[in-house]
Amino acid sequence: YVQVEAVLAQCDLYKTEGVALQEKTEKAQKSWAQREQNLQAEAVQLQQKYEKGLITSRDAQAQQESIQKKVASYQSNAQKEAQTLDEENYVFTNRAQDLLHRAVQEINSGKKYKLILNASALIDADTTLNITPAVLAKVNELYAADKKAEKK
């Protein structure tokens, strides 16, 4: 059996590229939240100015239209950025799954194992059947080979 989640969390691919992608996603989400707050605050401020009679209805309408354009632009940009991040996450996940699959195939190339299971489905098993460390080592080996091949 293989502890797939452990392999994916501990492999070099995740440590180098996965963590960076996760940080990039979190940074984008914080940026979106901040931008939304700023636009909402701008709209509230405009409403307060209008209610206090500090701005004409004509100016208020012009500023409201300006805010609406900013919101539309923000939403469009955020959507594009989210799609890019989704695609990057999709590619990253596929690469990780491919490395895992290739590692298991290489480890079992001699047909030493008749069945290899994901440990998440196990309730109890003999720990001598755990091939997680071997799979992790092979995943890292394949990742290093892939990185070396990309540089050529």
Question: Residue ranges of each PLM-predicted region?
Answer:
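Amphipathic, charged alpha-helical segments and their helix-to-coil junctions
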Residues: 1-152
